Amino acid sequence: MRVRGATAKRRLIGLVAAVLLLICGQVPQTAAARWKPQVGLPEWWDTDARGRGPARIILLYNSGGMPAWTVDRLRYYISHVTADGTPDHWFFDTVLVLALTGESQRSFEPNYGKGPALAEDWQQYLDGRLFGGLSELAALEKAVHEANARLGGSSHVVRVIISIPYPDPRATKFGTVEGKALNFSRAEDRAEAVRWYLREVSRRWSASQFEHLRLGGFYWVREEAPASDDDLLKLVSGLVGRQLLPFYWIPYFGSEGSGKWQELGFDVAIQQPNYFFYDVPPERIDEAARFAREHRMGVEIEMDRRVVNSPERRERYESYLNGGVDQGYLYSGTLAWYDDAALLECGQSKDPAVRRLYDTTYRFVSGKYRKQWSNDARIEK
């Protein structure tokens, strides 16, 4: 009932905007922010998989060797920070913390790193960057706490999704978990490692007693789902479901298994268009959006730090935002951002053309975006 009401409201806003366009010759910014897309929207796109309303997820990578996510860096994602360094609005509501490699550079995702990660890598990730002395979750907690103080409240909470390392079958000598030597060529040992990891994350999360963070789910880090992983994924889905948490996946464009993600047990899947990175036509964004609609998926918005120095890359990024209006995913329940820390650099930049991307992204995330017919970068309050 709430979904249908939201859809009707969106149509009414579009109609009002059209009338104003005929009368005044221009579209007011508030109406343009929700201009009717070029395609019909499925009703389920108004909520995430558990009906909790929109989720805007920023992917924060903490692979081995990457710079730590400090409070000063995180605040540009938790809140919108003005050009003079002052937080003035909340920004992303959900953070996905994920690593592709451990400190050893062994791989949590089989397409990266120097061979499969071992038990010591999984343990070190838990003990270090997640919950130990280098804990970026603790930094995130502090960043949200400080933003609450600056924005005049104390109750804002950010959801956190934690990635699950891939139990790579090549790790025939994975190491010891709870006194048992595991061999990932055996399906039961792969399952045992994931079961242990989920227990450890949940136990340590509870012990941390975060005030401003909520454990919001788990993420499958491998971006493809070969048939050989079907049984494992269904088992992991059950383990995550027992904690009453959603299970997330973000497959690349054309990835094996992406069309059957629900059968595999995922609660939320988000489609990568992969337009920003490769020499493919802009129509890729439309194609990915259509696939996402047909398969009840969200859409990933993509950029990297090349936007700082390349006008062509900035234009590519804005194609995703304009596509959100044309294809309707601006209004979808779940969107994710891959940015390679680019939004941080954009937010700190003194170059107006670069800083503009940060402000424009904020408008998109907050539902105030209008399609870019001009270089107007004003923020709606």
Q: Residue ranges of each PLM-predicted region?
A:
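Substrate-binding cleft of secreted/luminal carbohydrate-active enzymes
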Residues: 254, 270-381
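Acidic-and-aromatic substrate-binding clefts and catalytic sites of carbohydrate-active enzymes
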Residues: 61-77, 223-230, 250-258, 273-283, ...
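Aromatic-lined carbohydrate-recognition surfaces of secreted/lumenal glycan-active proteins
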Residues: 157-168, 181, 185-197, 216-223, ...
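N-terminal catalytic cores of secreted or lumenal carbohydrate-active enzymes
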Residues: 35-195
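Aromatic- and acid-rich polysaccharide-binding/catalytic face
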Residues: 212-222, 258, 262-279
